[in-house]
Amino acid sequence: MKFTKMHGLGNSYIYVDCFKELLKEEELPALAVAVADKNKGIGSDGMILICPSDRAPVKMRVFNNDGSEAKNCGNGLRCVAKFAFEHGYVKETSFDVETLGGLVKATVHPNDNGLVDTVTVNMGEPRLGRAQIPMLGEEAAEVVAEPFTIGEKEYRLTAVSMGNPHAIMFIDTIEDAPVEQVGPLLEKHEAFPDWVNVEFVQVVSPTEIHFRVWERGSGITQACGTGACAAVVASVLNGFTQKGQEVTVHLLGGDLTISWLENGDVLMTGAAETICEGTYVKGLSY
């Protein structure tokens, strides 16, 4: 199986070109776990398939390093857009990508050599009702700074879906974020039927925030694009910034520029990089 390893701000995945590779559906979860293993596999946060689509030039399927399939991945979207453009699957610089969470619009920014350094993705409108997250409780109600007890401590949660669920908590100092302690407890909390990505945010100013994440199905990662989008939406909902404002989000792996537009869409701009290409031969039944 030919693969390309790529990363967006250190959030790395093994990318498989399914225009050329034929994989068995029933083996995909186990394959994702195997290739993501840093000791016995290639090493990554998961596996992303770049597939043909009836609705768009390309389709993205995301598998976490535990084998579960995710609806969306912001960092993955940027890398898929870069791959699709550089490999000639699209000619335009703006095009749709199909995800399990719906269609998203990607715009690549090629350099003079025709290679893509950065990508802007229109992540669409955030979903804020409990039923859309999903989160148990009154279906239509928004969850903004809602008291929520985790362990023996009370936090204030803001819940946002960017095609996948996020629970955001604001803290005074990002270095004190209890990611390893609170992340796994909240990730699989019964209040979130589909589990949830857990984010901690420190607001520096209306144009700058710090961000840490415990990703659903992956644990601590260097970056989470949809999480950064959700964090900016949550910052607006809590009055720390405003719609239409570009916000720099500092993640462990680097920076993203996010804005929640007046029309409701969320734009994300950031880097996408290719690390290496190779052939994976272990454990395949074909």
Swiss-Prot record:
EC id: 5.1.1.7
A cellular-component GO term for this protein: cytosol
Isomerase among keywords: yes
Main enzyme class: isomerase
Matches recorded under InterPro entries: DAP_epimerase_AS, DAP_epimerase_DapF
Record carries keyword Cytoplasm: yes
PROSITE patterns reported in the protein's UniProt record: DAP_EPIMERASE
Entry keywords, A to Z: Amino-acid biosynthesis, Cytoplasm, Isomerase, Lysine biosynthesis
Active-site positions on this chain: 73 (proton donor), 224 (proton acceptor)
An annotated Gene Ontology molecular function: diaminopimelate epimerase activity
Pathway(s) served: Amino-acid biosynthesis; L-lysine biosynthesis via DAP pathway; DL-2,6-diaminopimelate from LL-2,6-diaminopimelate: step 1/1
Main localization of the protein described in the UniProt heading: cytoplasm
Record site feature (Could be important to modulate the pK values of the two catalytic cysteine residues), residues: 166, 215
Binding of substrate, residues: 11, 64, 74-75, 164, 197, 215-216, 225-226
Compartment(s) where it occurs, according to its Swiss-Prot or TrEMBL record: Cytoplasm
GO BP, sorted A to Z: lysine biosynthetic process via diaminopimelate
Catalytic reactions on record: (2S,6S)-2,6-diaminopimelate = meso-2,6-diaminopimelate
Source organism superkingdom: Bacteria
Role summary: Catalyzes the stereoinversion of LL-2,6-diaminopimelate (L,L-DAP) to meso-diaminopimelate (meso-DAP), a precursor of L-lysine and an essential component of the bacterial peptidoglycan.
Subunit structure: Homodimer.
Family: Belongs to the diaminopimelate epimerase family.
Xref: HAMAP family: DAP_epimerase
Protein name: Diaminopimelate epimerase
Organism per entry: Halalkalibacterium halodurans (strain ATCC BAA-125 / DSM 18197 / FERM 7344 / JCM 9153 / C-125) (Bacillus halodurans)
